[in-house]
Amino acid sequence: QEEPCATGPCCRRCKFKRAGKVCRVARGDWNDDYCTGKSCDCPKNPWNG
């Protein structure tokens, strides 16, 4: 069962977006960042330095 969330780039209608959903689009040499499915925050991609 999903935990509710109020706001954030990985929330939609008070639920977490699915894991793997892009939450921050790549810029320059950086890669996209993806939702984890467990948080409303958009975690930083570890490959982005």
Swiss-Prot record:
Keyword set includes Disulfide bond: yes
Subcellular location, record wording: Secreted
Residue span of motif Cell attachment site: 27-29
Residues spanning the membrane: none
Effect of W47A: Loss of inhibition of wound closure, but no change in platelet aggregation
Tissue-specific expression: Expressed by the venom gland.
GO cellular component: extracellular region
Effect of K21A: Only inhibition of platelet aggregation
Mutation effect (W30A): Loss of inhibition of wound closure, and of platelet aggregation
Keywords: Cell adhesion impairing toxin, Disulfide bond, Hemostasis impairing toxin, Platelet aggregation inhibiting toxin, Secreted, Toxin
Note: The disintegrin belongs to the short disintegrin subfamily.
Protein name: Disintegrin eristostatin
Organism from which the protein derives: Eristicophis macmahoni
Lineage of origin: Eukaryota, Metazoa, Chordata, Craniata, Vertebrata
